[in-house]
């Protein structure tokens, strides 16, 4: 099934990239004449045939999807479209934290065990432990709140809500 083709200079193959490199010089008379298209077509066909012959000789693996070829490692390194990203410079805070030995808070510090539900819940935020007082239909007044006048109640309502949360 494979056709044997002979070149004066053998091709360089990189089967990992499925590429063949022809370094033989081209015939200038055929490139400038009217046979240019047919010459390039036949040269390309011969080189592709040699590449296919080499690919067929590789070890094969049969799977449910079909026959797969085991490609060897690449020989030619391919260039990247963009340069490798440079490491980001350290911020002032990161430098300060590294010098002082400050570590970021761990996730476990944000959770509290809720004995009523038997699960770990966040301290703050959505479904947090701090929302527990807001959902209760009855909250006892403390001694401090009983002594306040109506004007003081209006002015200190925010303070009371904050003090209950903690």
Curated annotation (Swiss-Prot):
Keyword field contains Nucleus: yes
Residue span of region Disordered: 144-166
Family classification: Belongs to the RRS1 family.
Localization per record: Nucleus, Nucleolus
Protein name per the record: Ribosome biogenesis regulatory protein homolog
Function: Involved in ribosomal large subunit assembly.
Any one GO cellular component localisation term in the record: nucleus
In-chain residues carrying the UniProt-annotated modification Phosphoserine: 34, 64
One record GO biological process: ribosomal large subunit biogenesis
Organism in which the protein naturally occurs: Schizosaccharomyces pombe (strain 972 / ATCC 24843)
Amino acid composition bias (Basic residues), ranges on this chain: 156-166
Primary localization class, coarse: nucleus
Keyword entries, A-Z: Nucleus, Phosphoprotein, Ribosome biogenesis
Subunit structure: Component of a hexameric 5S RNP precursor complex, composed of 5S RNA, rrs1, rpf2, rpl5a/rpl5b, rpl11a/rpl11b and syo1; this complex acts as a precursor for ribosome assembly. Interacts with sad1.
């Amino acid at each position: 099934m494979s056709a044997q083709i002979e070149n004066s200079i053998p091709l360089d193959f990189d089967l990992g990239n499925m590429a063949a490199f022809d370094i033989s010089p081209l015939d200038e008379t055929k490139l400038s004449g009217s046979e240019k298209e047919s010459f390039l077509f036949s040269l390309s066909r011969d080189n592709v045939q040699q590449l296919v012959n080499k690919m067929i000789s590789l070890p094969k693996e049969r799977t449910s999807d079909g026959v797969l070829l085991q490609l060897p490692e690449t020989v030619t390194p391919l260039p990247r479209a963009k340069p490798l990203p440079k490491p980001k410079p350290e911020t002032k805070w990161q430098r300060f934290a590294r010098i002082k030995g400050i570590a970021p808070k761990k996730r476990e510090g944000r959770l509290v065990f809720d004995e009523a539900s038997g699960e770990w819940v966040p301290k703050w935020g959505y479904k947090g432990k701090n929302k527990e007082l807001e959902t209760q239909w009855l909250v006892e007044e403390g001694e401090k709140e009983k002594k306040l006048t109506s004007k003081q109640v209006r002015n200190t309502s925010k303070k009371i809500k904050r003090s209950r949360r903690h």
